[in-house]
């Protein structure tokens, strides 16, 4: 597996039901009814974070997913932690519903809001940088999604259309992502490490593939 030099290769990989993974975190999550449990799903661009987050959310009725890309939209690739903290995580920890519009949404006329409904049992915060050190007081569980860098880039190119503009965006993203993760090292805080490009046979509708050693 091709990875940046500071990131260790995890494994061996094993498939397990998403419900079983959630059960393994029981001691880390708040008691039902107090507030939503908050899970950070972090990983490099194109690693498979969104797919993993969706698998977790499917396993918990009424779970919510917040994508950090929605906070970063027309704001900054990585300098959005205060928006997530103040607009989403602080009210969630107070047991409040969230309907948050980041400043750029108003400035650029984007409709909708970042929503976490009242009574939501689980909030999955998905995105590169979700498990940074500064957000750890608001995260109950951390997942790092690891994928070969070549596979991640190829996946991102397919997702974004493979145009010259998409490639230029990828290069701009990587210019910030590489030093950010070299500093932050979120895999060192991970309760679970998952693979975003599993070669282990599994049912993607119900199972996730995680490192047996983490």
Regions from the PLM with identified roles:
Residues 113-159:
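ATP-dependent NMP and nucleoside kinases share a basic, alpha-helical "lid"
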Residues 44:
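P-loop (Walker A) phosphate-binding loop of NTP-binding proteins
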Residues 64-125:
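Conserved nucleotide-sensing/catalytic segment adjacent to the nucleotide-binding pocket
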